[in-house]
């Protein structure tokens, strides 16, 4: 027979962890392709005289054709990250772009991160400085 109880299952979308999103973005960033915009297929959106405004879908609004900067590379896919110009170098000072450069900055010679000497000094080499610091430890015996 019938009973007065029932089971309900509810499903919902859940975001992945911040770490996994960051890792995926970093992978795409590392594999980004330099492209050129080909204006041979460029078309301005068509104007309509309807009373109701018409917007073409974003993908079709401007038919930009992205071609790889290097002709030996394949064209980027819809999920690939692309860039038009390389980033400026941050190793050398560039006042016009507000880049102070990395000369004279303190680095950590044991780190493999962005504060590490190998990365921060851009392969120029670096001087090490050993310091002995005496501090009071307020120890009690």
Swiss-Prot record:
UniProt entry tagged with the keyword Cell division: no
Biased composition (Polar residues): 40-49
Annotated segments matching region Disordered: 40-61
One of the Pfam families matching this protein, by short name: wnt
Post-translational modification: Palmitoleoylated by porcupine. The lipid group functions as a sorting signal, targeting the ligand to polarized vesicles that transport wg to unique sites at the cell surface. Depalmitoleoylated by notum, leading to inhibit Wnt signaling pathway.
Cysteine-cysteine disulfides: 107-122
A GO molecular-function descriptor: frizzled binding
Xref: Gene3D superfamilies: 3.30.2460.20
Glycosylated residue positions: 108, 138
Keyword list, A-Z: Developmental protein, Disulfide bond, Extracellular matrix, Glycoprotein, Lipoprotein, Secreted, Segmentation polarity protein, Wnt signaling pathway
One GO cellular component term: extracellular space
GO terms classed as biological process: canonical Wnt signaling pathway; cell fate commitment; neuron differentiation; segment polarity determination
Highest taxon in the source lineage: Eukaryota
Lipidation (O-palmitoleoyl serine): 3
PANTHER family, per database record: PROTO-ONCOGENE WNT-1, WNT RELATED
Function statement: Segment polarity protein. Binds to the frizzled seven-transmembrane receptors. This protein is probably a growth factor.
Protein known as: Protein wingless
Organism: Manduca sexta
């Amino acid at each position: 027979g019938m009973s007065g109880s029932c089971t309900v299952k509810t499903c919902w979308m859940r975001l992945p962890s911040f770490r996994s999103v960051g890792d995926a973005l970093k992978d795409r960033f590392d594999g980004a392709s330099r492209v050129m915009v080909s204006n041979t297929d460029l078309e301005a959106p068509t104007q309509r005289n309807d009373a109701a405004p018409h917007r073409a879908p974003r993908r079709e609004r401007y038919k930009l054709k992205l071609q790889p900067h290097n002709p030996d590379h394949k064209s980027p896919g819809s999920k690939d990250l692309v860039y038009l110009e390389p980033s400026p170098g941050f190793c050398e000072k560039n006042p016009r772009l507000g880049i102070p450069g990395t000369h004279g900055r303190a680095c950590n010679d044991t780190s493999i991160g962005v504060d590490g000497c190998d990365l921060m000094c851009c392969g120029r080499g670096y001087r090490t400085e050993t310091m002995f610091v005496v501090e009071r430890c307020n120890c009690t015996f």
